[in-house]
């Protein structure tokens, strides 16, 4: 029987789990680490899931209709996912992004036909959000999905990512590790997994130099895609059991390690999440348990960054 898809968004989800056997052996880890490889989504990241979810819901409720203009602040991946979806559905898309994000992200957005507005890097995501809201107030028939406040964000992960992890491990997942950007992934996956297995441990990962969740103090950092500098509305702060701050350099080193040990190219936030997962996997009390770490995107969009530019 043939299995032929008719739109790119039908390809979203059902991403594979890869056991990191080489890293487990090299570092003599006590636990299994399974990596959820989100770059298998058609536009290359976990954010494809929420792009589809937010657009589907907006079309269902009539907020989006033919001729609408989508405007969204993004650190990159949500913008790329929205650009793919908007192209396929015929919407004009304006993305607002801090100028400090990688040049590859800018190029990818434009490649899908999106318009790009850059904001001052020092203002971070707050600056991008403010500019997007300003544009939305000026442009007729505009729709602002608002990934940081939109309940369709965590909903996508409750309905897809969480069930996929539970099913693919036959319910054997003991610990889930993910970086926190909007908070949608860890909220949706965490809520689903705890509904099926209440003793599952949820570990949040954030940049050490902008450890808002653990210290309340925001700052500049280089781990693109996580650490927005504030606590997003969609983040369920009761869902995680532990917060692990990660230094920028550890994220870079571990991202390169993934490429060189496992032959899998992932991004900076994936390096941060994997470093945290490896730290958990070294604990004696974790022996024999199964850790699932979500690796949010591909490393292709970071070739110009310290992740791969002049690596050690």
Which sequence ranges carry the predicted segments?
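PLP-dependent amino-acid enzyme catalytic core
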Residues: 1-312
């Amino acid at each position: 029987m043939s299995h032929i898809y008719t739109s790119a968004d039908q390809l979203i989800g059902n991403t594979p789990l890869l056991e990191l056997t080489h890293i487990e052996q090299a570092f003599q880890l006590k636990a299994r680490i399974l990596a959820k490889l989100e770059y298998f989504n058609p536009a290359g990241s976990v954010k494809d899931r929420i792009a589809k979810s937010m657009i589907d819901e907006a079309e269902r409720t009539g907020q989006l209709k033919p001729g609408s203009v989508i405007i969204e602040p993004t650190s990159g991946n949500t913008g790329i996912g929205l650009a793919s979806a908007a192209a396929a559905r015929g919407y004009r898309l304006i993305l607002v992004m801090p100028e400090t994000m990688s040049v590859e992200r800018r190029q990818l957005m434009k490649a899908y036909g999106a318009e790009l507005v850059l904001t001052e890097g020092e203002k971070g995501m707050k600056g991008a959000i403010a500019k997007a809201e300003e544009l939305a107030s000026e442009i007729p028939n505009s729709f602002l999905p608002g990934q940081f406040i939109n309940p369709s964000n965590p909903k996508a992960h409750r309905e897809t990512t969480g069930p996929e992890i539970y099913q693919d491990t036959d319910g054997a997942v003991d610990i889930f590790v993910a970086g926190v950007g909007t908070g949608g992934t860890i909220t949706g996956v965490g809520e689903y997994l705890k509904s099926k297995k209440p003793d599952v441990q949820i570990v949040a990962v954030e940049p050490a130099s902008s450890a808002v969740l653990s210290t309340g103090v925001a700052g500049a950092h280089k781990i693109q895609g996580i650490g927005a500098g504030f606590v997003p509305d969609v983040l369920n702060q009761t869902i995680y059991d532990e917060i692990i701050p990660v230094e920028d350099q550890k994220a870079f080193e571990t991202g390169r390690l993934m490429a060189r040990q496992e032959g899998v190219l992932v991004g900076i936030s994936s390096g941060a999440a994997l470093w945290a997962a490896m730290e958990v996997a070294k604990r004696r009390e974790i022996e024999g348990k199964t850790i699932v770490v979500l690796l949010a995107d591909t490393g292709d969009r970071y070739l110009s960054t310290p992740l791969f530019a002049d690596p050690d």
